[in-house]
Amino acid sequence: MLKKGPAVIGATCLTSALLLSGCGLFQSDKAAEEIDPPQDVTFVNDEAGANSNTTAAKKTESEKSDTAKADQASSTVMRELYLIDKNGYVVAQTLPLPKSESTAKQALEYLVQGGPVSEILPNGFRAVLPADTTVNVDIKKDGTAIADFSNEFKNYKKEDEQKIVQSVTWTLTQFSSIDKVKLRINGHELKEMPVGGTPISDDLSRKDGINLETAGVNDLTATHPLTVYYLAENEDSEYYVPVTKRIDNSEKDDITAAINELAKGPSKVSGLLTDFSEDVKLVSKPKIKDGRVTLDFNQSIFGSADEKTKMISSEVLNSIVLTLTEQPDVKSVSVKVNGKSELVNEKGEKLTEPVSRPSQVNTGSF
């Protein structure tokens, strides 16, 4: 298991804004909601400008600059794009896209190599779909999105086949109106991918998993998928990577299973990191009520060797919340240690309220 070292802590650009009590972790705005459109701005034509003094001129330039910045902010909206990182993982990056009425179609267009994403592509990431691919998206009332691609869609490398399916599925299902996805090429529904022949289920969804880890699994039918979140890093930041593992069907408590997988950590060859101690354990069965799960840990959950501090690291809490809220019945997470709610975050703030899942993750600047 790879532990997160001090270099990663210094490089973090995400966690300073995290762990607000009762708040989301990265981006609190819902993906399906748009920011307010820009208001009409009236400009006054100053015919006497030549007589204005220098101070007034500077003030006018400053006002214009502020207006331009406001217009730029109000003309974009943050979207999750599932891109491929340097380790080959499919990972969400939340990036500013121009406002569009065709939001789902636009999101897929930003997955195309050499397309508009090139101007905002984060360091260490690459686009997923082959260059020059075009797409239309038809969203049905039952929550199915039909993504119909052009012939260029076939021009991908075989090793990217599953990554493409996962990227398209997870990018589209960020929208509240989309639960499942079907793929087409020029109107013809795909039952398998065109290059490597990977079978495609009738309705692709997040239940199919992402960044599948099947090493050591002899019988897939005797297991079920469970997605957990580990850490990865690039030159200037760290980010969260979803990994779908296979859990034995004899395990009926997926919440406990998820915590055990987080404590176990990623495989040594994965290139992923963790801030979890291997000694972290739940001291009682998780309790779920009204979408809130309450977890009671042993003291190994603390990120400080000083027991008086009772601090949980932001990376640990974020991984827990992202992991558990992938499960449909969980909306927020409360954490206790040996039955007591005395934890604080890295800012020293008490975690008195449950922490909810963000609508968007990995919102670090590009």
Swiss-Prot record:
Keyword hit for Zinc: no
Gene Ontology biological process terms, A to Z: sporulation resulting in formation of a cellular spore
Pfam families linked: Germane
Signal peptide: none
Ranges of compositional bias, category Basic and acidic residues: 58-69
Function statement: Unknown. Affects both sporulation and germination.
Region (Disordered): 42-72, 346-366
Keywords: Germination, Sporulation
Biased composition, class Polar residues, residue ranges: 357-366
Lineage: Bacteria, Bacillati, Bacillota, Bacilli, Bacillales
Thylakoid is among the record's keywords: no
Protein name (database record): Spore germination protein GerM
Source species: Bacillus subtilis (strain 168)
InterPro entries: GerMN (IPR019606)
